[in-house]
């Protein structure tokens, strides 16, 4: 375990993330430009695909970080039966949900019920599929729909804010089931689908297209929002949310719906819109 990961056990997660949020939204020219220049240089951010490629134009660091891409920079897989990768990033893990458990790293796993904050909500995903995608600071930070769906419910699960970098994934037990997260439940033509937005150290917020800022809340209770009857339907490939810094999204699918795309594995670099899985059509 690295020193940084070890320190995250004792660091004041909330305080650091609150400070990061204040800096991310600062409109002080020197502050926001220093942040933009530092992150661009350190992580090799490529602005050539951004709708606004001039880093000086962004009013805040957060505006830069959640930047839109040029039209056509990402396109959905041409196969209409392909479920799509929800974001740019790197596969942390993917595979079957075996006996209700989701694989994190060698010797590490957690239950779907722990992740979703609800035993009953996890039942439809037993023996289904999961994919965990890590968004690094250089990546496009908007999350899109793998498949068309109607929003049924969101569940804000309070928790810690450990780093979600590779070393933490290998060494922090049940990492994604311990960090603060927003669970988004959708109804689709094949049944339920869940997209879980996992917060992390220095992540200053998660926003959804239907409700704006969802995290931070910094509460200590699970909070549910019922969207049944609201008619919030998002099409395949549509934007659904964004991270106001880097983090992780986990997609859960029920059994018998799709087969994972061949060639995908842990550590694979992926792009929004490429095939994650393909429908199993009788």
UniProtKB/Swiss-Prot annotation:
User: How is it modified post-translationally?
Assistant: Is synthesized initially as an inactive proenzyme. Formation of the active enzyme involves a self-maturation process in which the active site pyruvoyl group is generated from an internal serine residue via an autocatalytic post-translational modification. Two non-identical subunits are generated from the proenzyme in this reaction, and the pyruvate is formed at the N-terminus of the alpha chain, which is derived from the carboxyl end of the proenzyme.
* Gene Ontology molecular function, alphabetical: phosphatidylserine decarboxylase activity
Cofactor dependence: pyruvate
The keyword Ribosomal protein is annotated on this UniProt entry: no
Q: Which domain of life is it from?
A: Bacteria
- Residues annotated as coiled-coil are none
Which terms under GO biological process does the entry name?
Answer: phosphatidylethanolamine biosynthetic process
Modified sites of kind Pyruvic acid (Ser)? 247
User: Active site: which residues?
Assistant: 88, 144, 247
What does the entry's cofactor note say about binding and number? Binds 1 pyruvoyl group covalently per subunit.
What EC number(s) has UniProt assigned to this enzyme? 4.1.1.65
Pathway of action = Phospholipid metabolism; phosphatidylethanolamine biosynthesis; phosphatidylethanolamine from CDP-diacylglycerol: step 2/2
Compartmental location: Cell membrane
Q: Where is this site: Cleavage (non-hydrolytic)?
A: 246-247
Q: Which family does it belong to?
A: Belongs to the phosphatidylserine decarboxylase family. PSD-B subfamily. Prokaryotic type I sub-subfamily.
* PANTHER family the UniProt entry points to: PHOSPHATIDYLSERINE DECARBOXYLASE (PTHR10067), PHOSPHATIDYLSERINE DECARBOXYLASE PROENZYME, MITOCHONDRIAL (PTHR10067:SF6)
What does this protein do, in the record's words?
A: Catalyzes the formation of phosphatidylethanolamine (PtdEtn) from phosphatidylserine (PtdSer).
- How would you summarize the oligomeric state and partners of this protein? Heterodimer of a large membrane-associated beta subunit and a small pyruvoyl-containing alpha subunit.
What this protein is called in its record is: Phosphatidylserine decarboxylase proenzyme
The scientific name of the source species is Xanthomonas campestris pv. campestris (strain B100)
Q: Which gene encodes it?
A: psd
């Amino acid at each position: 375990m690295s020193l940084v990961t070890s320190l995250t056990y004792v660091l004041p997660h909330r305080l650091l993330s609150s400070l990061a949020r204040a800096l991310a939204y600062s409109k002080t020219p020197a502050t926001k430009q220093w942040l933009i220049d530092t992150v661009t240089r350190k992580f090799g951010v490529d602005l050539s695909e951004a709708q606004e490629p001039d880093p000086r134009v962004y009013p805040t660091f957060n505006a830069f970080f959640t930047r839109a891409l040029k039209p056509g920079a990402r396109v959905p897989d041409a196969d209409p039966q392909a479920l799509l990768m929800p974001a740019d990033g790197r596969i942390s893990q993917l595979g079957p949900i075996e006996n209700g458990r989701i694989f994190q790293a060698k010797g590490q796993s957690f239950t779907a019920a722990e992740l979703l904050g609800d035993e009953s909500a996890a039942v439809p995903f037993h023996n289904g599929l999961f994919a965990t995608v890590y968004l690094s600071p250089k990546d496009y930070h908007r999350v899109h729909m793998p498949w068309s769906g109607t929003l049924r419910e969101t569940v804000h699960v309070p928790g810690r804010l450990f780093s979600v970098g590779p070393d933490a994934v290998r060494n922090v037990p049940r990492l994604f089931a311990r960090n603060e997260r927003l669970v988004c439940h959708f109804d689709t033509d094949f049944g339920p689908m869940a997209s879980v937005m996992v917060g992390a150290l220095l992540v200053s917020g998660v926003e959804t297209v239907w409700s704006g800022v969802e995290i931070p809340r910094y509460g200590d209770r699970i909070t549910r929002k019922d969207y049944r009857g609201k008619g919030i339907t998002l099409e395949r490939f549509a934007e659904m949310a964004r991270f106001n810094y880097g983090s992780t999204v986990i997609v859960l699918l029920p059994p018998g719906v799709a087969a994972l795309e061949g060639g995908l594995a842990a550590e694979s670099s992926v792009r929004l819109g490429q095939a994650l899985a393909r429908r199993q059509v009788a």
